[in-house]
């Protein structure tokens, strides 16, 4: 499984949920439908559906995507509160939807994905921010997440 591509797809789907105000189960259903189409005779280009360089979905950890999207949706209020504790002079609703999605995924991983080291989560979050947001956002996200893991309360 390719964790980097999996996280990237998860971020794109979480962004889609925020922009379209869709529920996780709708997004997951659409994803599974696209996987079935890719495996069947109606082969679609996953790159066309989910963006450049996604390749096919056989290297994506679909269980992770489903677990994280549902987990973020279920725990969104708690995640928002947790993230806002570390936003100095900012509110979560002022951040871009991309930055917000990246922070939610990483915070969810800190709290619920015991097999993922915190530093790996942070590095992947920074790379996503560099690719989909800005260098400034990457530094900002690094600072927020770095402060989070310094706080004993957030640690697993």
Curated annotation (Swiss-Prot):
Q: Which UniProt keywords apply?
A: RNA-binding, Transcription, Transcription antitermination, Transcription regulation
Molecular function as annotated in GO: RNA binding
Protein name (database record): Transcription antitermination protein NusB
- Family, as annotated: Belongs to the NusB family.
One of this protein's Pfam families, by short name?
NusB
**A single GO CC term, please?**
cytosol
Stated role? Involved in transcription antitermination. Required for transcription of ribosomal RNA (rRNA) genes. Binds specifically to the boxA antiterminator sequence of the ribosomal RNA (rrn) operons.
Matching Gene3D superfamilies: NusB-like
The lineage is:
Bacteria, Bacillati, Bacillota, Clostridia, Eubacteriales
